[in-house]
UniProtKB/Swiss-Prot annotation:
Chief place of localization: secreted
Keyword DNA damage: no
Gene Ontology MF: a single term: ion channel inhibitor activity
Keyword Nucleotide-binding listed: no
Subcellular location: Secreted
Name the record gives this protein: Conotoxin LeD51
InterPro entries membership: Conotoxin
Protein keywords: Disulfide bond, Knottin, Neurotoxin, Secreted, Signal, Toxin
Gene Ontology CC, one term: extracellular region
Organism of origin: Conus litteratus (Lettered cone)
């Protein structure tokens, strides 16, 4: 009878530990999703912010990241 009681206690501890680990995993997944969404938003803005990258049509040098506009933004 004592062995059965000990076995049940060990099983209960293992199950509660597993439940805690699973909950922690869910929180980590949510944190990872938030982190990746922030990175995606930064990538959508472009490497240098709101300026245009190379070979993009422009009207003024201030539109280009390089500050060099000759109908298209130049890299340098």
């Amino acid at each position: 009878m004592e062995k059965l009681t000990i076995l049940l206690l060990v099983a209960a501890v293992l199950m509660s530990t597993q439940a805690l680990v699973e909950r922690a995993g869910e929180n980590r997944s949510k944190e990872n999703i938030k982190f990746l969404l922030k990175r995606k938003r930064a990538a959508d803005r472009g490497m240098w912010g709101k300026c245009k990258d190379g070979l993009t049509t422009c009207l003024a040098p201030s539109e280009c990241c390089s500050g060099n506009c000759e109908q298209n933004c130049k890299m340098w």
